[in-house]
Amino acid sequence: FESLPVKPDITICVFGYLGENETARAHWQEAEKIIHSNYTGAVSILNVVSNFYAKQQKGTIVGISSVAGERGRQSNYIYGSAKAGFTAYLSGLRNRLFREGVHVVSIQPGFVYTRMTEGLSLPPLLTAKPEQVAEAVYRAIEKKINVVYVKWFWRWIMLIIKCIPEFIFKKMKL
């Protein structure tokens, strides 16, 4: 970032690695790859960007996180925990940078048709196209929205999932 001749006014952090949950449970290297891809890598980049924007007292940071980070589920809890950390990071960054004139956006897309989800059996109604994610990002930047669920119903789906008492939730196969 430091070596760029012209710094961007908007930084969009959009990368992720779902990984193999079963492999990650058995082999730390896979878990580490998931964590570094979804949390450590993003934070290392955005720390540099956020400090620059804070000094400039302007800029926009967009982080693509995941609804998977809103509640740990057996099917992807390592990926979900990394995204939970990233979502919390974005929230803290937003809190820190608001008074500096920097806008921080968290995008919670739900399922998206990408290379990362190729081969997965995704429910079409719940799955966004990359163009829908791009439109949501653009709208959030233009309207200074803080948290965006690409498909509106994900906000309510996750609210319901988060409200399930733990003694019931732990018995569910999600």
What is each PLM-predicted segment?
Residues S106, L122-I157:
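C-terminal helical subdomain
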Residues P109-G119:
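Short, flexible catalytic-loop segment of classical short-chain dehydrogenase/reductase
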Residues I10, G16-E32, S75:
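Conserved mid-core segment of classical short-chain dehydrogenase/reductases
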